[in-house]
Curated annotation (Swiss-Prot):
Pfam family, one: MATH_2
Coiled coil: 225-262
Keyword Electron transport: no
PROSITE patterns: MATH
Domain of life: Eukaryota
MATH domain residues: 7-130
Protein name as annotated: MATH domain and coiled-coil domain-containing protein At2g42460
Classification via PANTHER family: MATH DOMAIN-CONTAINING PROTEIN (PTHR46236:SF12), TRAF-LIKE SUPERFAMILY PROTEIN (PTHR46236)
Keywords from the named record: Coiled coil
Length: 299
């Protein structure tokens, strides 16, 4: 898949890594108009065999009410020589008041860091690649339009969109892990955005949109939403897009073949007009009437 073009935003050097047991944080840096930092859990976050990596907003309370940032993110782990040890996948997600940080719970298998030759001098470098795709500041004016619906804060204008989902899939939100109504509402917004996306015709989907859609789907599934129907829909879109891309490629190849044949044909025609015709001896010799000697006239 094609990746979104991300920029290296920050590099963090971590010394004496194997001796780290507790969560550690980087210095603060700026991205998307926010102060950010990287959080590492050397012994994992629910998965003891993995290193966990997160990007967090440094001082979310200093931002305007209703702030949010949509961003794409990945991390690269390097050793002291600059050799790449591991690269995470690219994720696309939302930062906001209820979700000031997110990242990768299973960013890197710890077995990779047990190799002393790979982990030189017990030192790691973490490179952070970010692209902020949306910056929003929202005030409190929409709060009065919020309604409680099935444990979620929903805008009155969204009820018509949310009701059919609960009617068709009544248990789809039964297992979600967040208990805060505000956090649940953020994920519901992600769900509604994803549903709107997958309802677009497959032929107008870009690869970037598909990457973002799958990233949103992963976020929803990780917090417990039962959204297999959305995964099936996305898989159908992905397959339809692949068939279209393959068909377009075959058509391009066919046209290229026709163009090549036409070029060769034009060359042959040009050659036949330019090259002189080879003439035989007969073509050069003019016809001569046979000479017949005259007989003398007898008197």
């Amino acid at each position: 898949m094609m990746e979104i073009d991300l920029q290296k935003t920050f590099t963090w050097k971590i010394e004496n890594f194997s001796g780290r047991k507790f969560p550690i944080t980087s210095t603060v840096f700026s991205s998307g108009g926010c102060e950010c930092y990287v959080l590492i859990r050397p012994k994992g976050d629910g998965f003891e065999d993995y290193l966990s990596l997160y990007l967090c907003v440094g001082n979310p309370k200093s931002l305007q009410p209703g702030w949010k940032r949509r961003a794409s993110l990945h991390f690269i782990v390097l050793n002291q020589s600059g050799k790449e040890v591991h690269r995470t996948s690219e994720r696309y997600g939302l930062f906001g008041p209820e979700i000031p940080g997110w990242g990768f719970r299973t960013a890197l298998p710890l077995t990779k860091l047990q190799d002393r030759e790979l982990l030189e001098n017990n030192t790691l470098f973490i490179e952070v690649y970010i692209k902020v795709t949306e910056v929003v500041h929202e005030g409190d004016e929409t709060r009065k339009d919020m309604l409680d619906f099935k444990g979620f804060n929903v805008l009155s204008s969204q009820i018509a969109s949310v009701s059919p989902i609960f009617a068709k899939y009544p248990k789809f939100a039964d297992d979600i892990k967040p208990t805060s109504k505000a956090v649940k509402t953020v994920y519901l917004k992600i769900l509604l955005g994803l549903i709107k996306t997958v309802n677009k015709p497959p032929e107008i989907f870009s690869e970037t949109e598909l990457i973002k859609a799958y990233s949103s789907l992963i976020d929803l599934m990780e917090v417990g939403f039962r959204v297999k129907w959305l995964k099936s829909k996305l898989d159908e879109i992905s397959l339809a897009r692949k068939k279209k891309v393959d068909a377009d490629a075959a058509r391009v190849q066919e046209l290229e073949g026709k163009v090549k044949n036409q070029v060769e044909l034009d060359k042959e025609k040009t050659k036949s007009h330019v090259e002189p015709k080879m003439l035989s001896f007969k073509d050069y010799a003019s016809p001569v009437s046979p000479w017949i000697p005259r007989r003398k006239r007898s008197d």
